[in-house]
């Protein structure tokens, strides 16, 4: 059975919600989805005073376990147009996996969030791609076959690079139905391709 890791970092819960939608998409294909998060780097008292979402039941991933999966779909909010440091820090510890080629041939994909429509969603997802390529992974996005990313009738995230959500500056906007559909589509798309590559 194809095994897919949905690995995320979420300060306020938006990416967490998207991660579980991605996992639903993975499971819709018959593949196994495992949802885990990366460790928090912010001191607990600072996280609490900043109103971070502290009750996230997903277990914390370890670097070594990445080799156990056929595909890895990562999600993290944008920070000034690039990947949040918590996720970047996690991947910066994968040198041993790179040296041994443990991720070569696996599928890599990414999703994100930002406060505004032009807050760096595409640059954040693109920020993951060099890491995937250095590991020898096959990069997969969100194809235009998902028609939900078309049109200008409503505010919505999502691009050919990957699913995304727009949170508003105060975090009050939750992922919309179309954004969650995009996450599910991406999860299913990745799982199907991973199954073919690992056959």
UniProtKB/Swiss-Prot annotation:
Which Pfam families does the record cross-reference, listed alphabetically?
Answer: FMN_red
* Keyword NAD (UniProt): yes
Q: Where does FMN bind?
A: 10-15, 78-80, 113-119, 134
Gene Ontology molecular function, alphabetical = flavin adenine dinucleotide binding; FMN binding; NAD binding; NADH:ubiquinone reductase (non-electrogenic) activity; NADP binding; NADPH dehydrogenase (quinone) activity
* EC number assigned by the record: 1.6.5.2
Ranges of residues in domain Flavodoxin-like: 4-190
Source organism, top-level taxon: Bacteria
Q: Which UniProt keywords apply?
A: Flavoprotein, FMN, NAD, NADP, Nucleotide-binding, Oxidoreductase
Q: Which residues form a coiled coil?
A: none
Q: Which residues bind NAD(+)?
A: 12
Q: What is this protein called?
A: NAD(P)H dehydrogenase (quinone)
* Protein source organism: Agrobacterium fabrum (strain C58 / ATCC 33970) (Agrobacterium tumefaciens (strain C58))
């Amino acid at each position: 059975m194809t095994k897919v890791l949905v690995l995320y970092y979420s300060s306020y819960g938006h990416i967490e919600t998207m991660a579980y939608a991605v996992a639903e998409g993975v499971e819709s294909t018959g593949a196994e989805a495992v949802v885990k998060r990366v460790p928090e780097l912010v001191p607990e008292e600072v996280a609490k005073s900043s109103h971070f979402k502290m009750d996230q039941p997903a277990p914390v991933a370890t670097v070594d376990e990445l080799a156990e999966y056929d595909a890895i779909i990562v999600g993290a909010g944008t920070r000034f147009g690039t990947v949040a440091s918590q996720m970047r820090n996690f991947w910066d510890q994968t040198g041993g996996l790179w040296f041994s080629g443990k991720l070569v041939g696996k599928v890599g994909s990414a999703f994100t969030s930002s406060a505004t429509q032009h807050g760096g969603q595409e640059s954040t997802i693109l920020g993951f791609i060099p890491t995937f390529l250095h590991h020898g992974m096959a990069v997969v996005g969100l194809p235009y076959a998902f028609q939900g990313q078309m049109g200008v009738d409503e505010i919505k995230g999502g691009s050919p690079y990957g699913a995304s959500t727009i949170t508003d500056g105060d975090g009050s906007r939750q992922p919309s139905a179309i954004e969650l559909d995009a996450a599910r589509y991406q999860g299913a798309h990745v799982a199907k391709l991973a199954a073919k590559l690992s056959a």
